[in-house]
Curated annotation (Swiss-Prot):
This is Putative nickel insertion protein. Belongs to the LarC family. Pfam families: Ni_insertion. The keyword Chloroplast does not apply. The keyword RNA-binding does not apply. HAMAP family: LarC.
Length: 392
């Protein structure tokens, strides 16, 4: 059965608050440490800790990243490559890369440069990388399929950054907040950080009132500061959707009769990197007996506008049709299991809470095949033996 999370952002949202709230829902800190170790970051460049604290007499979990590597500037391309080259599971990599992609797009627009030329300052630091990748790791551990958030407080005043003193919300944050519900019913201070806004921009299907759901757990993550008006806490409600509630999935498609296979393959890569759930091509017959291709992609409703714009800019399409669809999905989670090649991540699928099947993660098998010079299908066969798949 699918799980959803609703973030109650009454005080705002940041990267560390998000990770803290998800850890408070039951993600083990050791699991987060082990998964982050799959990134090619020096093990001694940071340390993680959690502790219980209070914000205006309300208990919450505080997540701290002590940074020992003081380098704060990294290019978007370097960070994206770092995540892409890691042995993290596919869903974790996709979510983390989608968040950084939204950040890069916002920074590029604000500073008038190409996305590939974006250099992150505060967001390029190790703690921000940990916050973003850590969010993706925790969501995957909890088996979360959908994410929503309450309307966001804008905040006011000014914030000190590497670019100097900037108004609140910071320009990149303001860009990321486009299309989201916001309000001004809060005191001064930065309530929504660029990282927090990027997490919602990339992953949330809606920023609105709490959806109908059966709540199974509540996590509370504390921010670094105390505000005079409200407890600086992010609450995360984990549960199951009620009744026939849609998870906001859409199918978008367009017909193309004058493109090359190379270009279409490139567009598929761009769509998947930008957060599309699936992309596929269907051969079709078009007017004047022209053979063509129907390009289709599946996405959350919050990403439709951006993905459609990508297709319209990168292809000869002059329009895109889209419609909502319902899905029946299996519950899933990731688990590391011992194999003859060492520990590898497996995707576990469940039906009505009962184990259905397990499969090794493709990228991990691909890495083993390349490193050891073994055919990929042989690696998959070996690690798919019953004693491994059943966890024996």
């Amino acid at each position: 059965m699918k799980h959803i999370i609703h973030f109650d952002c009454f005080a705002g949202i940041s990267g560390d608050m998000t990770v803290a709230a998800l850890l408070d829902l039951g993600v083990p800190l050791e699991h987060l440490r082990d998964e982050l170790a799959r990134l090619d970051l020096p093990r001694d460049s940071y340390s993680l800790s959690i502790h219980r604290t209070e914000r205006r007499h309300l208990a919450a979990l505080r997540f701290d990243v002590q940074v020992l590597d003081q380098r704060t500037e990294r290019g978007y391309a370097a960070i994206d490559g770092l995540i892409a080259a890691s042995s993290l599971s596919g869903p974790v990599r996709e979510r983390a890369r989608a968040i950084f992609r939204r950040l890069a797009e916002a920074e590029a627009l604000v500073h008038g440069v190409a996305v590939g030329e974006v250099h992150f300052h505060e967001v390029g630091a190790v703690d921000s990388i940990v916050d973003i990748v850590g969010t993706a790791i925790c969501l995957d551990y909890l088996g979360v399929d959908g994410l929503s958030a309450a309307p966001l407080p804008l905040g006011s005043g000014f914030v000190h950054t590497a670019h100097g003193v900037l108004p609140v919300p910071a320009p990149a944050t303001a860009e990321l907040l486009k299309g989201m519900a916001v309000h001004g019913e809060c005191g001064p201070g930065e309530r929504v950080t660029p990282t927090g806004a990027a997490i919602l921009a990339a992953l949330a299907t809606s920023v609105t009132a709490q959806p109908a759901m059966t709540v199974t757990a509540v996590g509370s993550g504390a921010g670094s500061r105390d505000f005079p008006d409200v407890p600086n806490i992010l609450r995360a409600f984990l549960g199951r959707p009620e009744g026939e509630m849609s998870d906001g999935v859409l199918v978008a498609e367009t017909n193309i009769d004058d493109s090359t296979p190379e270009l279409l393959g490139y567009v598929m890569e761009l769509l998947l990197e930008a957060g599309a759930l699936d992309v596929f091509f269907t051969p079709i017959q078009m007017k004047k007996n022209r053979p063509g291709v129907q390009l289709s992609f599946l996405c959350r409703s919050g990403l439709l506008e951006r993905l459609a714009a990508l297709v319209l800019v990168e292809t000869s399409a002059i329009g895109i049709r889209h419609y909502p669809v319902s899905r029946t999905t299996l519950e899933r989670c990731m688990e590391e299991r011992e194999t003859p090649f060492g520990p590898l991540p497996f995707k576990l699928l469940f039906h009505d809470g009962r184990p259905l099947r397990a499969a090794p993660e493709y990228e991990a098998c691909r890495r083993v095949a390349r490193e050891r010079g073994i055919p990929l299908q042989e690696v998959i066969r070996i690690v798919s033996q019953p004693t491994v798949v059943e966890g024996g």
